[in-house]
Amino acid sequence: MKPHPTPGRASEQLTKEDCLEMFRQLYLARYFDVRLIKEKKRGRLRGTLYSSHNQEAIIVGSIFGLRPTDWISPVHRDMPMFFMKDMRAGWRNPDRMGMSIEEVCAQVWCKSGSPGRARDNWSHIGSLEKRIIHSTSMLAGTIPVAAGVVLADRLNGGDAVVLTFNGEGSTAQGIFHEAINYAAIHKLPVITVVENNQWAYGTPVQLEVPTEDVADRAKGYGIPGYIADGQDVFDVYDKVMEAVEYARSGKGPSIVECKTFRAYGHGDHDDDRAAKYRDPHEVEEGRLRDPLAICRRRLIEKSYLTADDAIRFMAEGKSSSEATTEDFPPEVVAYLDEGIRFALASPEPPAEEGGMWVFKESE
């Protein structure tokens, strides 16, 4: 990995409370993943799950420093991002600019009143009020939408930036070029975060990108390309905040490549161990650099965590089947449990709604 130099690291300005909050959010993202996988294996969930295991540092570090008025456009592996946006304002703060855990759990359980109206169990949702752009299955398809959103914001005198998240495979799509080219010409504050987990479903990165670093694509547009260690929440925070300041100052878009590794198959329908398209040794090596363990080590070095505190919760290094509730802080378990209880108690969608919300209803 060739790290991009970051003058004046933004993470050095974080308080002890900020750093510990990041640590808790990493655990929350991991527990969300662990719990949902367990629920699916018990037959309590429908649809497909896309695990964010091993990629939590990108979810937490990239949005931690955003303003409430900034926009995000998550991809399918970023499900916790929907309820983690603006979480620094308070996990239970009803006024924060992020979805509630109840809304997201209702979405996952396909319940009536969920953001997706039970049409989908995963990430094809959004909220204009909360400044979360609706996601799409079309690779790189949200980048031009993100460009349009911040163009409108700029025309209205705003100073918001947008983070649009994509896998490395999406950078091989034509719309990726068209959207970033347009954003570069008009200096739009679009930050394209590329979650390079080395695999686009079953296609390795070297068959998608001809260069060693995806961030090199930025050179063709005359914009910055940053490279972050996607396992280190503080490095992700630093690189994204540098891109945010660049964009907010009116200089335009950038690409932030977060190098990470996909812990499991593409989704729970893809048993890559049975398909054998990934080397088991490569998978084992990729899982060794757990973002929770890296953050824990950094906090101990800063004396923000004592030795006793550091061993209280040990979810890192454990697979979803191995981890238990005892491996997670009680406030994390309680928060997600509230959302799940709400979802389970919510009604199923009535059959008569099946034809609704397909087209815009007339006034």
What are these regions (language model features)?
Residues H76, C258-T260, V358:
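A general secondary-structure junction signal
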Residues V34-I37, R44-H186, P204-P210, A215, ...:
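Cofactor-binding active-site loop characterized by glycine-rich and histidine/acidic residues
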Residues F82-M84, G202, H266, E353:
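Short acidic, gly/pro-rich beta-turn/loop elements at beta-sheet edges
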Residues M1-I58, F64, H266, D270-E363:
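Conserved acidic/glycine
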Residues I132-D337, A345:
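Glycine-rich ThDP/TPP pyrophosphate-binding loop and its adjacent helix/strand module
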Residues K2, F23, G113-P115, N181, ...:
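Short acidic/polar alpha-helix capping motifs at helix-coil junctions
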